[in-house]
Amino acid sequence: DRDSCVDKSRCSKYGYYQECQDCCKKAGHNGGTCMFFKCKCA
């Protein structure tokens, strides 16, 4: 699920956490970035 990483992955305010990117990749996406403390899959 595209939004499942939002709750699971904590983010810093700027840039992305590796945790977010890994979660998104496991979900089948290319990766993820963090915006406003939330993980977004891309």
Curated annotation (Swiss-Prot):
GO molecular-function terms, A-Z: potassium channel inhibitor activity; toxin activity
Bridged cysteine pairs (disulfide): C5-C23, C11-C34, C20-C39, C24-C41
Keywords: Disulfide bond, Ion channel impairing toxin, Knottin, Neurotoxin, Potassium channel impairing toxin, Secreted, Toxin, Voltage-gated potassium channel impairing toxin
Signal peptide boundaries: none
Localization terms from the record: Secreted
Record InterPro entries: Ergtoxin, Scorpion_toxin-like_sf
PROSITE patterns reported in the protein's UniProt record: ERGTX
Main location as per UniProt: secreted
Expression tissues: Expressed by the venom gland.
One Gene Ontology CC term in the entry: extracellular region
Keyword hit for Disulfide bond: yes
Note from the entry: Negative results: does not affect human Kv11.2/KCNH6/ERG2.
Comment field on protein domains: The presence of a 'disulfide through disulfide knot' structurally defines this protein as a knottin. Has the CSalpha/beta fold, which comprises one or two short alpha helices connected to anti-parallel beta-sheets stabilized by three or four disulfide bonds.
The protein's role, per its UniProt record: Blocks in a reversible manner human and rat Kv11.1/KCNH2/ERG1 potassium channels. Also completely and irreversibly blocks rat Kv11.2/KCNH6/ERG2 and human Kv11.3/KCNH7/ERG3 channels.
Similarity section: Belongs to the ergtoxin family. Gamma-KTx 1 subfamily.
Official protein name in the record: Potassium channel toxin gamma-KTx 1.7
